[in-house]
Amino acid sequence: MSKIPVIVIVGPTAVGKTSLSIELAKKLDGEIISGDSMQVYRGLDIGTAKITPEEMDEIKHYLIDVTDPSEPFTAAKFQTETRKWIETIHQAGKLPIIVGGTGLYIQSVFYDYDFGNVSEDKAYRAELEQLNKTLLWQMLEQQDPESAAQIHENNKRRVIRALEVMHLTGKPFSEYQVHNVLNDTYKPLFLGLDLDRALLYERINQRVNLMFEEGLVTEAKKLYDQHLVDVPAVCGIGYKELFPYFEGKSSLEEAKELIQKNSRHFAKRQLTWFRNRMEIDWIQAGVSTTEAEALNKAETFLSVK
């Protein structure tokens, strides 16, 4: 049986992945699967820079708004769902296109990740629960920098799980999870968008400013009022930074600057992770030739049977 071709567009936040994916889908008769761990949640629209129906431009999208913020959507769940939708899109005679910045989720689709059979150490986990999230993430960064590059400091639950797995097995969480052999079912082309660091950071700052103009504070306040302050859905950047403001512990400007700072750091970690963990064909973003170069690489890839 021939392998299913899949175009995968990755890169840091605010680099232009969404607009490129729409253009490629139009020209290559594709449908798009979101590879973003946050855009699966309903109601998390502004803070996740979720694509709007207008921006979709009649291109069918999958794995957007599929669960409530109170329900965790794990990498294992993403793996299962994405593989299902790849098959569905392919059977319909369309080209599956995955776009997103959550490297662990995307990689899990194409490599045979093991999500799971390490048991728990409840006593050790209870000890870790007593530590603050910054210290926990620093512990992870020292012991397993690859996992730390992918897991955000705010995601305390996942940081603790990574430390727990290392405690129980003696090997890094990142090594435990992935077998570096591509799954035989798919033939992926990984296209990465890169941008001058200063320009990328300016884009990020501008995006955060726009989020505030579009109502990010109201969106975050709804989560806060629903007591959804510790669920994985709000561990992403853009929500928890506002909670101290709601509690009168920081100013709105301080919250905005913290979101911008955390977003810049996250973009840097994304780039590091993609460069170290996946074989990616990199394209310069933000120039007049970006779309043409991506289309040329995709058409060449698809022409090889």
From Swiss-Prot:
- Tell me which Gene Ontology terms the entry assigns under biological process: tRNA modification
Question: What Enzyme Commission number(s) apply to this enzyme?
Answer: 2.5.1.75
**Annotated site residues (Interaction with substrate tRNA) in this chain:** T102
Q: Which domain of life is it from?
A: Bacteria
Q: Which reaction does it catalyse?
A: adenosine(37) in tRNA + dimethylallyl diphosphate = N(6)-dimethylallyladenosine(37) in tRNA + diphosphate
Q: Where does substrate bind?
A: T13, A14, V15, G16, K17, T18
Which positions in this protein are listed as binding ATP?
G11, P12, T13, A14, V15, G16, K17, T18
Stored HAMAP family:
IPP_trans
> What does this gene product do?
Catalyzes the transfer of a dimethylallyl group onto the adenine at position 37 in tRNAs that read codons beginning with uridine, leading to the formation of N6-(dimethylallyl)adenosine (i(6)A).
Write down what this protein is called: tRNA dimethylallyltransferase
What organism is the protein native to?
Listeria monocytogenes serovar 1/2a (strain ATCC BAA-679 / EGD-e)
